[in-house]
Amino acid sequence: MARRHTRGLWITSAGLPQTGHAGRVTQPSLASSGHRVLGGPSWRPGQPLDKRGLARLAAEQFDLLTHAQCRAAGLGWKVIDHRVRSGRWTRAYPGIYLTRPGRDDPLTTMTAALLAVGEPSALSHESAAYLHGLRRMPPQPHLLVPAGRAPAPPGVVVHRTRHLEARVDELAWPWRTGVEHTVLDCADLASMTLDEAVDLVARACAQRLTTPAQLGAALAGRARHRLRADLVDVLTDVGAGAES
């Protein structure tokens, strides 16, 4: 099966990514006040930022910059506007600039949505499943945000939770939910059948991204999961098969 490397992911000819050694960025950073996230851009608000640092930040963010980041590096409103008007940059979302126009690969598309929604947030559901190599890329980015957050930009599907921090993979960039919660989030979607959910569980375990025990532990905290009873049985069967 043919595959190509795209900034930390191996994209197969079937359209599913395979994680590579560069799939995690481990520079220390803070997702928000009180939310510790280890992966992500090396620059954080409040830190000094020069033009060279801005270029490095764009590279870390798949050629994307936020308006706040540009301003922190000393770019004035007129400079930013000129770069957009001249076609040197394009707007991915309001306040989000693509510094290499025409780039539309999955990582850029999803990171643009993540930056547009703002912190704290993480790619979730089918978007996170794509990044974990479990599903095809969905037509719209899915993000998990804290309960009570404002509406998302057009074209972005937002899911709200009171447990965001506990469900985010602390090492991955772009920020995303961990494998166990990604599988359970997808299985909780009304559009996913039980057979599809079982296949997703089996695939995650077969790829050794997680185990039935780890999935069961995550499921234990989801009393209202629509497939809870079915998944308990499935995880028991999968676990028994793995031990035999």
Question: Positions of the model-derived regions?
Answer:
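Acidic-basic catalytic patches of nuclease active cores, encompassing PD-(D/E)XK
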Residues: 238-244
